Amino acid sequence: MILSGDYHTHTPYSHGKNTVLENALAAKAKGLKEIAITDHGFNHIIFGLKRKKLASLRSEIIEAEKLTGIKVLMGMESNLISVDGDSDMTESDWKYFDIYLCGIHEVVRFKSFSDMRDVMMKNYAAYKLGKKPSDKVIENTTKAYINIVKNNPVDILTHINYKCFCDLKEVAKCCSDYGTYIEINTKKRHVSAEELNIMA
């Protein structure tokens, strides 16, 4: 397989180390044709992208494209913030972005305490204890992933099953139905080879 793009990169606008231009230069050196700058979503308490910085980020992206010849997409790795499938990239934000990633993350402002408890806290407790979450927790996480895909124009779900466990087959079927890709993230081991076969 020849890779032509990298659609999950960060910059100092969230917690990345390299600038937009440095990411584009690295992509060009690796023979890639395009990349996406997908800094963490607005509700991330520590690393969240700020709405007031969007114009500056777009300006850097335009400049990086000119200097490198690489196609640079402006995106965001938004945060899933409720079981109902809400995201911190709201409908009014969609027009600012070229690509829409979404995942479940820690240290995020959820829509409500019950959403944080049901989507993150119970999953994370099981993860830290090395146990499988209850069927109800898996059901809630699965519902959250399915709802985010159904209710939003999500292009890519990021690192599903990393600390937050779902029914992979059900989520994969929903993504297939709605044209949403599922990221396989080699930095965060989140699905096994057997689970990949289940999702296929």
Q: Where are the model-predicted features located?
A:
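Conserved beta-strand positions in the central sheet of alpha/beta enzyme cores
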Residues: 36-37, 101, 158, 183
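Histidine-centered catalytic micro-motifs
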Residues: 4-14, 37-42, 157-161
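N-terminal small/glycine-rich loop or linker at the start of catalytic domains
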Residues: 1-8, 116-121
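Extended substrate/RNA-proximal surfaces in nucleic-acid metabolism proteins
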Residues: 47-178
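His/Asp/Glu-enriched short active-site or ligand-binding loop at hydrolase and phosphoryl-transfer sites
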Residues: 179-191
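A generic structural signal for well-ordered alpha-helical segments
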Residues: 27, 65, 175, 199-200
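Metal-associated gating/positioning segment near the N- to mid-region
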Residues: 13-51
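Histidine/acidic-residue-rich catalytic or RNA/ligand-binding cores of hydrolases
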Residues: 15-19, 166-172, 191-200
